Amino acid sequence: MRQFIVIGHDVPTDPDAVSLADLPGAGRLDVLCRCLNSAFFLSHDLRDNVRVWLVVGDEYAIRFEGSELRRLNPDERSTAALVRGALAAREKAIGSMAANPSPGVYIRTQSLSGLLESVADDGPLVTLHEDGQPVVDIDPSAEPTFVLSDHHSFDDAETALLAAHADRRVSLGPEPLHADHAITVAHNYLDTDGYNRY
């Protein structure tokens, strides 16, 4: 299973602070919605072998399971409604037990540190960063967990956590990419067996 962990630095944890009419004003929730859409959507289908984690406020981890998703649509507004619905269910997430407010959407109380520890055995943990090694150094047959940031760079604490937990720091090309575009390029690399099969 391919996994993507996206850190949302400014997204509010209070669902009442998330206006579907102003996604950029909701801590740039629009960026996270584009990441979700890039992770799951194909031309006429959804990727069912993908899991996306949104880390919100370093307090909640919202998980989207491709094999279970039923209400994900390609527009940012309806995607944001799923995120807001997850945040509205946050108080039902007790300890490490997740709440499940919608098919394929789960929320639990968990920091980035705890999430990195919980996915450590799932496959190689790869930080996507413009200063990393070229992506071609990653074995495309592996099922990596990619970690990337929203419109902000990783802060010092996140950088230290990733240095301690990640197996690699990888760049997807010579130019910095938006997070949602980086997800598309990472998918393409894995889909083509390292750019060898089209």
Swiss-Prot record:
EC number: 2.1.1.257
GO MF assignments: S-adenosylmethionine-dependent methyltransferase activity; tRNA methyltransferase activity
Subcellular location(s) per record: Cytoplasm
Keywords: Cytoplasm, Methyltransferase, S-adenosyl-L-methionine, Transferase, tRNA processing
Key word Methyltransferase present: yes
Function: Specifically catalyzes the N1-methylation of pseudouridine at position 54 (Psi54) in tRNAs.
Protein name per Swiss-Prot or TrEMBL: tRNA (pseudouridine(54)-N(1))-methyltransferase
